[in-house]
Amino acid sequence: MAIRAKKAGFDGIEVCANHHVPLSQFLSPMFNHRTDEYGGSNENRARFVIEIIKKIREKLGNEYIILLKLNSEDDDPNGITPEGFITACKLAEQAGVDMIEVTGMKWKKNRENKLVYFDMGKILADTLKIPILVTGGVKNLYVANDALNNSNIQYIGICRAFLSEPDILVKWKNCEDKKSQCVSCMNCYKIDNSIEINCILNKRKKKKNLKKNN
């Protein structure tokens, strides 16, 4: 798939080892109970992900951009530890990753205007030499700027705020309302895969407008 992405003209790819997909499960002791070279220690649990990164780097060359997205926590006491997360990130940097995206499983519960993984992202940015991107709960321009100005974190990831307001960056650039209308209700997450992903707040607005016009 990575080779196809390069042939198609993409500048880089992201290896997803987050949100309990199979690669994420290798990293987490909550799922990984293996007793061979792919389980047991933090280094062993990271081995499969690192092997994939090395193979991608080998096939695509040193100039191709590779990102790694992984959980910094599993929202479970038996999940990945801070030490396990940092170890995996260090090994990924050594394997040739160009950037790491920090996420986890607590973003579903976040209804506050704060960057959920700021603390872990800050630690990682102080530990590694490669750029760090932190995502999870960014719905406020002040929160994003505060994170960038008060740490070595270089990038902020935004998702649900875009679903709610696709033009939110234009608003922020024009110094309009600094806060997204997104309330982290997670209805966009619950929508059936057979239909388009949308924000329930926008659907309600459309219904109100239709009623007004009628």
Show which residues each predicted segment covers.
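Flavin-dependent oxidoreductase catalytic cores
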Residues: 1-214
